[in-house]
């Protein structure tokens, strides 16, 4: 019980009035203020300095200081509890009046004390001015309220508690008592401190001897206190407004006057608008109407309203308004602006008069309730009006209100009694067995309602929805319309007045100014106080039909209702601003008649011009038309200023004026301090505990943790756990600190005006020094060092990387502009220089291409590189670091070998010593026991065995030495062939040398010293002499080649300039001879590894293996027999040769024979599709030499524009990279096509049983989708257009199917056969060929298709029913077939090839515009059709040209595609003709063709150049529209970073000359996202486009939502290609059945298409992961319901399957989404495989086969 009583007593004591009063009293006493500091000064210094003046004067000053301190505290305490005093002392004007004189007096007092000196009697203490000043000093400091720890919150809490507390006297007494005790406590503490100081003699002596004797210290101490007081007072003066009174609400009147002027201008221009009447609150803000022009208001309000009387009468001669105190201490705070609330609708913004913190009482439900959001103006008005209301009226109102309250209280008591009785009855009925029906509880709530009081004591109440007192001003919505009173009236109104809002909007008066506002009132707005109307209408005139829909807020439109006495209306006027403020963006967005100025301030910015369309036009006009008038030039300049595209650059500094209304008072920031150069977030010292400490000591902190935590306190575990968090925090702090420093540096350059000019010139000097002096000198020094160290120099690689480095001029914020053009006003605004692909000096270049992380950087003034502007310089990779790493590796290897050798040596010595001791012991035993009888059967067999072992050991050592010498001879012979095998041979020799040391004893080593000496000499010869000879030969060859290049280049240029049409044949032969010499030297240098293996196609390698002789195979054998190769690698190589059929396993162990063609044929016959006839083999062998010549010539060409990704990471030779001759682009596509073609056909050569074609599948077995790989390979594709897509070894991460649209022009629809006949019942030896049926008949050959190339057909070879398509599996009969080499796999993913074939046969199956998005081609445009026809004609003509014509045509304006085709075709034609025909015929034919074709080209080029000149302007504007329209979206933190990266890249590409190279590099490095950027089909001029559309550069993000359902619909449409929109031809189905050999389709199964088989290898992993984890989120994607439903319905209606089949198919399609094993898919697709074709080997089919019904 005692515990419970104590538990209940404690809250009562804590919440009691006495305890709360004591708490607030102590808090007011303990608030630290500057007066405490000066009190300590007075108590401390006066005792020491005034000893000579006497004790009485000392005590007087002390008493004056304490009394001033206590009096100031007491007045501040009273001001908390007394409102007028708090208002007087807490307002800014009070501080202005009190603080300024005090500061002046204190300043003069500390500076010149003779100012107050005068002759007076010192004995009279009243006249002593110092005592009064001490008292005034401590007293005034308290009144100024300059608190270090603010107490404004404390004052508010005290006032709230005073309002709520009942026993106020007890609260005041307790708080005063606590305050008094607190003051005494503070004074006693000061006294104790002073006494303790006096007792300490050391402190007292130092203070007296050193400080007080020095007069400078006393002066300095007084200055410190004075300056401290001055700073604190200035801090308080920061919230003081200017003491000059101005007119109230001057900014409102200015804005209204500006609005009226604008309306007058519009009326003068002929715009029919009415002047909008200013809507004002009738009950609030009387004084705000002083400067406004009042307008007439309708007389529809209550005549007896007091508020209306107060509005009509102006209060004059009010003493409190004229008084000075009222002017200074106005509680309404004149010139205080209201925050503008922007309204997006057409109406003016509402005046929100609610306050967050102001509270007052109001009467509701018979009680005084506290409102914390009471209107300030209403309470102020009540305070002003109370003194003017007579006392009798107040008593009468109170009596009436009490009488009403009594009735309300009586009803509530009655209701509570009823509820109590009902509750007791329910409790009693719970125990009864049967429940008794209880009466319903009727709870009545009585609240104040709004009603209309008539004289007949009848009150008409409003409904609850329309009553603002019940629902509040922001809760109810009123539907503006008619209230039907009865049925007849409603029917009559429906006939006479159209209730439909659309009809009403049409019939409204559109000439008035507020027509837009009338239209907007029909929309529902949440923050709108709507009116209500109750009236009876009897309209007979048709003219008034349009004026029935009433808006009660717009009172000026209701004047017509006064004519009718039957209309009664009750309305509430909403306070609105009479003007609409606009921002700067809204001012720009006006299409016609923009306003002169904006009203809301925007952020300060600097405009940077990015694109000027009229810049070039003005320069050309100035050259040609120099005689024009000056007026026209000025007009053009003004128009060009408007057409410029400008980006606003915002300075990186805080801007507190953003969003404020002009001519308004700024926010009152009372306790805000700005102590830094750049302070983004200004806040009060109240939040000091939440700030990060500026002065941190990380080293001392870490030292303290290491010493105390581990050794003293033993809390190492807790500190170790916190290290992870501290590291993350340190990283975050470092980033913030670096960003802050960067911004400070940038702002520091803006402080001085000349600094930007100096910095700009320094940056330009640094770019010149870096590009022209420093980097070339480093390259020269590096290569000279390599030559001196007998290494091959790397001039070409270094110069290539140096040329790749580009310096781009950027704006001050880092926005790239161009390489040559400077930004406008860059001297004053600043400039940045961005370096793309910065050069980094390397000791050697790696053989494998490495992706550099440093793609770009910025240049500093000191020539260093930084990642961000004004950032810290980054660490560049060291030149000597890789050299030192290699040396460290070698030293470590040598140490390891030395340790192993020492261990082996110790073991050998131990072994030899044991054998020696054993022999000696045996001899002693034999000598000592000679007389012992010999045991029969015992002989000295151990010695004989040892001798035999030693002999056998010597013989093995001799054989090994002989074998070593033979191998070393072979190594010396092949030394110049393979220079890079040196390390392997040396390692082999060292291993043999170690074996000899281990096995041979000490005596044997001495005997065999001659052999070791010979081996050592041979080693010196191989390592030093041969290497020097080889290096000299290489350097001389390089020098000779470089000189040859220069000579023949000069000859070639001379001949080309001399004869531009006819090229001399001798120069051509010379160049051919040079190429042969190059190939000969190159093959001699590198032998069989002469060319880059990465550039060879796999088809050529497979073909060359069986054609090579014994020597190459013997080299393979020697490689397999070497001891350095591990055994498991040998076995794998042998097994692979055995499986491929190149050689037998038995021959590998013995001697290899010459490989025959039969072995090659047997290997091909493993797959039945390669089982060819003898005639086909003969044709294949005949083309062998041509194929080999073409491939060799192809690889002799040097790679210039080929990307590093084409190497596929293969090993390169040292000299193969140093080639600079450009390779034709078409050869690259040949390689892609041949490699992909062979990879598809040979991917399953080892899995013979898995091949569908090589065997007959039994019934009931499913045919796998991936096994039937031949259907994915195009056999003969004749009608395709070659698009030059660069070869990319690594598949890109394609997320969306955005390729070119493919159009097929079908003249007549005829029966179309299938391309591939699949015979599943055939045996292994049966052959299945590719049947190339004539797919489309009766096609007009004169009209060219989009993807067609005219081919010179050979009727003898290309027969329609020929089956020789598989002969071209290596591309060796390309010349016979005369078809273009295409790469269809690059256009689509590998899995789309089969569907593409089906699409060509049946183009109506899949809508092409749904499957493949097309943004560049338009069928309706006739101009583009003519262009495509001209392109095709040019291509047909260019293929018949020779090599000389193609070189001449490269200088013309013809496009790049025709150039590459002509070069490729001409080279192949000329070489083949030279082999078959004689030289004379080729020369004559080429000359005749050249003369005829050049004239055609000149005519075509002239027509093309005219069209090109017309479209130059359009293409520039198209680039601008696509790339620069979204550049205004800078500064939005919610937007993605990838979008801004794309914009920066677009800015760079706009002014580059070679855009294609840079765009390809950006796309390959994935710096450029093609998904984000939009496209534009229509081309406009930029000024016209802006004028027509009225487009505004608004910083809004571009939101792109991926439509998941639409993507799924596309995939389903692809997967079900066997069904079409049209009726399926039955004959076509029968042919498929007969050809495929499928007698029973119901028993055969095929895998249904799974989503993972469609996308590319990288997209599969991402798509499968999204389906497994986020498939539920697809329900929220917005789709085109009309499109999806239409196509889906057509699909299912045309198919018409059974219900079960539909359900099974849907389950099968959705099966991956509901399997738990899909998590294994996520793990399975984590493998990173670059080749998408080989990725199918890793897939496992988890899905059940699906049966196809015919």
Swiss-Prot record:
Membrane topology classification: Multi-pass membrane protein
Places the protein is found: Plastid, Chloroplast inner membrane
Biased composition (Basic and acidic residues): 260-277, 727-738, 1420-1512
Entry's Gene Ontology cellular component terms: chloroplast inner membrane
InterPro entries the UniProt entry points to: TIC214
Residue span of region Disordered: 260-282, 617-638, 718-738, 1205-1225, 1419-1512
A GO BP annotation: protein transport
Low complexity: bias regions: 617-629
Sequence similarity: Belongs to the TIC214 family.
Subunit-structure text: Part of the Tic complex.
PANTHER family documented for this protein: PROTEIN TIC 214, PROTEIN TIC 214-RELATED
Function: Involved in protein precursor import into chloroplasts. May be part of an intermediate translocation complex acting as a protein-conducting channel at the inner envelope.
UniProt-recorded name of the protein: Protein TIC 214
Organism: Cuscuta reflexa
Origin organism lineage: Eukaryota, Viridiplantae, Streptophyta, Embryophyta, Tracheophyta
